[in-house]
Amino acid sequence: MTRSEALFEQAKKTIPGGVNSPVRAFNGVGGSPLFIEKADGAYIYDADGKAYIDYVGSWGPMILGHNHPKIREAVLAAVHNGLSFGAPTELEVQMAEKVIAMVPSIEQVRMVSSGTEATMSAIRLARGFTNRDKILKFEGCYHGHADCLLVKAGSGALTLGQPSSPGIPEDFAKHTLTAVYNDLDSVRSLFEQYPTEISCIIIEPVAGNMNCIPPIPGFLEGLRSLCDEFGALLIIDEVMTGFRVSKSGAQGHYGVTPDLTTLGKVIGGGMPVGAFGGRKDVMQFIAPTGPVYQAGTLSGNPIAMSAGLAQMEALCEEGLYEALSAKTKRIAEGFKAAADKHGIPMAINYVGGMFGFFFTEQEHITRFDQVTKCNIEHFRTFYHGMLDEGVYLAPSAYEAGFLSMAHGEEELRLTLEAADRVLARMKAAN
């Protein structure tokens, strides 16, 4: 038994499922999860001391790589001044100014402690500002675990929301409408059915929780137009894509202006953090300037602000995003080339520092229903093969992969050579 396996057995005695977030349990791929002891650059190291080239990056925040010296130094310096004050700090102001400077649609921003808090608060604000109850989300998009957001569509059909987790009253879920991602007709149909009841659309501009699905041309622009036509707010959830797809997020990359934006992951440099911001007239509706209540004991935590500011400063380096995109393209297209070489059907998507691969004969994956038809057994086999080769991918066929600036030529080469060997073994076995 490895030390990771032993720790997992020990953890299950005191922690539900042995983990503090479900995907970490490896239920999507089978086997026992790795327990991580440390990380540096492009590598993570498990409890047995084995190194892995990491394409999870703490689920997105580690865009510069693990344990980056500038971030580490900023955190250590901040710790000497205290861990939390429960009062305003100059660091919060600096972070707000940095976010506003990088994302033109954000005129004011409120810091929180997680992505779930950010999306939950943005939706409450949208409901309060519009005085409407219903929200519109998309099948397969994840926006955190707030009650109103854990809702799915039935068989891809347009539907009044049904809870997708016990513990969510149907009275909550009925206000959540679910449309089909990358299908404007499904959105217009809901607006025509509820023309004065929908407060907002919330969307992942690149869906990263059904693997990696970019928007088709015109989709985000169409959502903007529909919101304008029916008086709803457009919330772009950039918790995952913010400052990962481009310096101004996915909204900058695709040229779409939302009313509100949610952020997380990258802006914390690896620390727990979230934020929501947007039009000043909307943001002024939040307490203490407005009637919509939102608060948080650790919001704007000085350690998180210090880490985030250090990372955000580094992201302004000229040519960084072009280099990151080139690395991502090489990995995604390298996986596809290896799969083609061995006659294993695969489709790929990638944008900025995010990528996804799908074991399927479908050529272009643009919707959630296509993702659910992919070969999960092939994914599991590939996943464990890569893990044995020292490459750590997201342990779920429904999660995106992430590159960092720490992934160099050697890491990319080793990863693609490993993929070639694993796919060759898969072909031989079949």
From Swiss-Prot:
Question: Which enzyme class, named as a word?
Answer: isomerase
What are the recorded GO MF terms, alphabetically?
glutamate-1-semialdehyde 2,1-aminomutase activity; pyridoxal phosphate binding; transaminase activity
Swiss-Prot/TrEMBL catalytic activity: (S)-4-amino-5-oxopentanoate = 5-aminolevulinate
Origin: domain of life = Bacteria
Q: Write down the Pfam families for this protein, in alphabetical order.
A: Aminotran_3 (PF00202)
Looking at the UniProt record for this protein, which Gene Ontology cellular component terms does it annotate, in alphabetical order? Answer: cytoplasm
Q: What biological-process GO terms show up in the record?
A: protoporphyrinogen IX biosynthetic process
**Pathway(s) this gene product operates in, as recorded in its UniProt entry:** Porphyrin-containing compound metabolism; protoporphyrin-IX biosynthesis; 5-aminolevulinate from L-glutamyl-tRNA(Glu): step 2/2
- InterPro entries documented for this protein: 4pyrrol_synth_GluAld_NH2Trfase, Aminotrans_3, Aminotrans_3_PPA_site, PyrdxlP-dep_Trfase, PyrdxlP-dep_Trfase_major, PyrdxlP-dep_Trfase_small
The EC number(s) this enzyme carries: 5.4.3.8
Query: What family name appears in the similarity comment?
Result: Belongs to the class-III pyridoxal-phosphate-dependent aminotransferase family. HemL subfamily.
NCBIfam families (UniProt xref): hemL (TIGR00713), PRK00062.1 (NF000818)
Q: What is this protein called?
A: Glutamate-1-semialdehyde 2,1-aminomutase
Organism of provenance: Shewanella oneidensis (strain ATCC 700550 / JCM 31522 / CIP 106686 / LMG 19005 / NCIMB 14063 / MR-1)
